[in-house]
C-alpha cells in the first residue's frame, strides 16, 4: 500500500502524530483515479488494527488539540474533528484549492484552520503540477481564526507565515459545534455511499488506469467535474 499521511513534528524534531488520509476524492479525472490507499479503501482492516477512534484522530499537544487532513470536498469530516475536540485543523492541498472552503472550516466549527497549498512553480515546467489557474490562483496558504477571519496569508509565492493563537483565551469561550442531529439523522440513515468501503482490501490497483477500472466496477454512480 502507498499511504497518504500527514505527519506532525514537535519542536524537538520528534514525531508527535501521523494521521492517515480518510478518503481519496473520486471522479475528478476521467480515465484516471488515485491508487494510494486511504482509510476508506481498507476500512475493515484499519478498524481491526487501530480501532474506530483512529479514523478521525485528534492529537493532544501542549499548544492545542490538533487534527490534520488532506481531504477536500467533505466538510462533514471537519465537523467531526471539532466534535472530537480539535482546536486547530491543519489542512494541505496540492492544487485544486478552494480558499473559501478553508476559511469556512474555521467559520462553521469555531476553531483555527491552517492551509498549506502549492505555491507558484518558479522552476522548470512540471507536467504534474497544479497551477490552480481555475481556482483563484496558486499559493494563498493561510491561517484562519475561529470566526473565519484571516490571520495570515502567504500570497502566491513560497513564504513562511505565522500567527499567535491565544489558546487559553480561546478555550475559555470555545464550545463544540451546536448540531441539531435529530433533523438530519433520517436523511443520513437513508444515504448510500457512492462506492462501498474496502475497495483495495483484496486487490491493489497498480496504476491510475487500474484504479479507474476498479472504481467503475464498484461505483453506484459516476460523474466528473
Regions found by a protein language model. Name each.
Residues 1-87, 100-104:
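Active-site catalytic loop in hydrolytic enzyme cores
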Residues 118-225:
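C-terminal beta-strand edge segments of enzyme domains
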Residues 64-67, 71-164:
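CN hydrolase (nitrilase-like) catalytic-core segments centered on the catalytic cysteine
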Residues 35, 40-46, 50, 99, ...:
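Sequence-level detector for tyrosine residue identity
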Residues 22, 93, 177-180:
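Alpha-helix boundary/capping residues
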Residues 14, 24-27, 97, 121, ...:
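Surface-exposed, flexible loop/turn segments at secondary-structure boundaries
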